Regions:
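Amphipathic alpha-helical segments with low aromatic content
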Residues: 1-18, 159-218, 339, 345-386
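Non-catalytic DNA-recognition/assembly elements of restriction-modification systems
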Residues: 8-32, 208-232, 243-255
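Proline-centric
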Residues: 11-16, 103-110, 141, 146-162, ...
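IQ-motif-like calmodulin-binding regions
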Residues: 23-26, 69, 117, 201
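Short beta-strand/loop turn elements enriched in aromatics
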Residues: 26-47
């Protein structure tokens, strides 16, 4: 712990952070539920939320539950990509009860919750003390309390803790607000997809733009889209680097795998001539309007058979198909190309396609804003903690 000051600090703070043992800050929490709380105050450690319906435990067993007061921390020993040996979570939602299988600690003094919620949860800070005070349990890692309390951590003054906690809470609130906006936009899109495309055999949708009343025409997807095998666009090297120019895509959820410096075998999609990459096995798909390469041949590249059709409308028609693959087989030729869909006039296609393009652009903008806020918080954590 040679470096005892963070890279970024508020004005007026210059003292080194003090090395403290966790035993100066926390003690083992042994409080049990003596009928203070019912099942509606059961806390989920995974999400730090109250489970008003409880967790399935009988009322008789609640007496064995641990009481988790506001400010207490619980050790959750499941490992993950983010937390290699488990993690601590701080109760900032109010007094409640939790499963007795989790180890909990209680502060020995008044401690700023907003600061410690972030600090004791931060893997780069907590990894070392957790590694040196856990053992492998039956279902997850278990905390050896005495060994943990003997570990040390660097701590700023209480006033600096308050400042840092206030800033990180502000960022968290911005992230939460933008996440709510994004979730709302996605729900709105789901609703529009349900109402602006025919369903249950109908030839017209429930919701239409003014001036359109004609029935939609039935077509097979194979009549709408041409497909191209992607073999010649497969990337040769998977040594990706963000400084390279050409994106490497997959039709799966991750979509962008990285960037390559290969200059041959590039699919030159453009805004004027986009394509859909269709995963032949999972049936996932993405709209692409920029040059790219791909990772594997397990997809089809789809383009319009009739360029007078609106591409974005047809893409959303494809995305709106409710189909869950039941086996590991290719789906475009054998199944999807035979699916019957409905298409309206070119003018109505244009209206609907433009509407969903604008909506998707708005969703992408909010996703980008949310990503930048999370990156901003990550930077604060790296530079404001020691």
């Amino acid at each position: 712990m040679s470096n005892k000051v963070p890279q970024i600090r508020f004005n007026g703070y210059s003292d080194a952070w003090e090395e403290r043992k966790f035993s100066d800050l926390y003690k083992k929490n042994l409080e049990r539920n003596k009928e203070q709380f019912g099942s509606d105050r059961t806390i989920s450690i995974a999400t730090m939320r109250f489970k008003e319906e409880g967790n399935g435990a009988s009322e008789d067993s609640l007496a064995s539950y641990k009481v988790l007061r506001e400010g207490d921390v619980a050790f959750e020993g499941h490992t993950s990509k983010q937390f290699a040996f488990g993690r601590f979570v701080l109760n900032d939602i109010g007094d409640g009860i939790m499963s007795p299988r989790f180890t909990t600690l209680r502060p020995t003094q008044d401690m700023p919750i907003a600061f410690w919620k972030q600090y004791i949860h931060y893997e780069p800070i907590m990894r070392y003390p957790i590694v040196h005070s856990t053992k492998l349990g039956t279902m997850m890692n278990e905390l050896v309390v005495d060994e943990f309390l003997n570990q040390s951590v660097l701590v700023p003054s209480v006033t600096e803790q308050l400042k840092i906690g206030q800033l990180l809470t502000l960022v968290d609130n911005l992230i939460a607000a933008n996440q709510r906006k994004l979730d709302l936009l996605k729900e709105q899109k789901k609703g529009y997809l349900q109402k602006m495309f025919p369903k249950n055999g109908a030839k017209v949708p429930e919701l239409r733009f003014a001036g359109f009343a004609d029935d939609w025409e039935e077509r097979k997807l194979g009549e709408i889209f041409n497909y191209e095998q992607p073999t010649k666009y497969i990337v040769k090297s998977t040594e990706y680097d963000d400084t390279f120019n050409t994106p490497v895509l997959t039709a799966g959820k991750s979509f962008l795998l990285g960037y390559t410096d290969e200059i041959t075998g590039i699919k030159n999609a453009t805004v004027e001539n986009p394509v859909v990459i269709f995963d032949d096995f999972t049936t996932g798909s993405h709209y692409v309007d920029f040059p790219f390469k791909i990772k594997s041949s397990a997809m089809k590249l789809l383009s319009l058979n009739d360029n007078s059709d609106n591409f974005y409308f047809m893409f959303n028609t494809l995305k709106n198909i409710k189909y869950i693959p039941q086996s590991h087989e290719r789906h475009w030729i054998s199944k999807f190309s035979e699916f019957e869909i409905y298409k309206p006039s070119q003018e109505e296609q244009q209206k609907i396609g433009s509407f969903f393009k604008q909506l998707d652009d708005t969703i992408a903008l909010h996703q980008r804003k949310l990503y930048l806020l999370k990156e901003q918080k990550k930077g604060y954590l790296q530079k404001m903690f020691v």
